[in-house]
Amino acid sequence: MPLDLNSDLGEGFGSWTMGDDAAMLDLVTSANIACGFHAGDPSIMRRTCALAAERGVRIGAHVGHRDLVGFGRRRIEIDPADLRDEVLYQIGALDGFARAAGSRVSYVKPHGALYHSAAARRDLADAVLAAMTDLDPKLVLLGPAGTELEHAATAAGVRFIGEGFADRAYTPEGRLAPRGRAGAVLDADAAVAQAVAIATEGRARVVEGGTVEVGAGSVCVHGDTPAAVEMARRIRDALAAAGVVVEAFV
């Protein structure tokens, strides 16, 4: 079964950059591009969309809370109606730059705190899906399988793709272990092994030991981790060696 490889990109701001987006775009098949709320700005959005379009990489809107200082990782209480508008705003803005580059936004992936809160709360998940269908009912949602995001997508008639993480350990319940927890962020060797395990066995490492089932049609390699590009290159090589075809899900 083919597997998509994605990364969070375009997460700089002004003269400040994070990661080597150009090099990462040579390796991934889908790019989750920041839309200016948790990171990114109009110039970075334009540039990253152009780089992705040149390489035939699918463009996804990486939507988050309006929280540049906290990089979108702080929990923010928000009315679902306001969240719907903020998500629609972000998707629409990125789609403008994607179309200017000859491409389009084909999927949406929530970022950071929104990723986790919308996975747990149906009202927030419904707001994300409402924003997506407001713009284009054919948009695909990328997120954690078996959560309120998947349930909301099913109810809205939106295609859902489960996501696994190569460089993160999980809880026994199949959720990402908090970043601050010992062993939650995997080194390169462990990340390579986990990507192959997700692709071939549908399982990922549990932070306390053992493994847990992870339903994923796409695997994320974070672009802000040390040596992220080399890790992504090793993951692609390992997947190929395991007979896994890497291709975009849209």
Curated annotation (Swiss-Prot):
Listed EC numbers: 3.5.2.9
Coiled coil: none
HAMAP family for the chain: PxpA
SUPFAM superfamilies to which the protein is assigned, alphabetical: Glycoside hydrolase/deacetylase
Single GO MF annotation: 5-oxoprolinase (ATP-hydrolyzing) activity
Protein name: 5-oxoprolinase subunit A
Annotated function: Catalyzes the cleavage of 5-oxoproline to form L-glutamate coupled to the hydrolysis of ATP to ADP and inorganic phosphate.
Lineage start: Bacteria, Bacillati, Actinomycetota, Actinomycetes, Mycobacteriales
ATP-binding found in the keyword field: yes
EC supergroup of this enzyme: hydrolase
Gene: pxpA
UniProt xrefs under NCBIfam families: PRK05406.1-3 (NF003814), PRK05406.1-5 (NF003816)
Subunit relationships: Forms a complex composed of PxpA, PxpB and PxpC.
